Amino acid sequence: MTERLISLLREKNMKIATAESCTGGLLASKLTSVPGASRVFEYGFVTYSEGAKQKLIGVNEETLRRHSVYSSAVAEEMAVGCMEAAGADVGIGITGVAGTEPEIVMVDGVPTTVDPGTVYIACCCKRDGCTTVKVQRFMKSACARIGDGFREIIRENASDFAIEIAIEEIERCTNDTKS
């Protein structure tokens, strides 16, 4: 699947950038493990803190306050921000809770619980200014029998899902629906 994304980017003469939080650079690592990725991979941002998201890729403070760092709105701003900062054609933003405990965040001033395994992934394509936001939630109970590896399962699944979303978005943006 990763090879397919790199091949598609090369075929379409497009560049990609990533902005990752809960995956901690795993997506960028997967992309750059494919021979020839240097022709299409521009930047990989690991923006774990809110400050890094604001400073490096332009996530709006108001968006963080109104929606929290764990939201589709922030994932979308991460995708657009990394794409613009890198001068790329495609941007992917990933944010979420990969840990085993719920996170309490403020959403418009109201304390809100975000469950473990809640991951927001956004992909945008510069060709037509379109942005697709997909929400994927990986359930802790489904992974419980595996043991202590829940965090790694979330990170792996989120980065793989981001690759799938990118392929779909590039095909949609370039009006190429061939599989």
Which positions does each model-derived feature cover?
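Short alpha-helical segments enriched in small residues
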Residues: 1-179
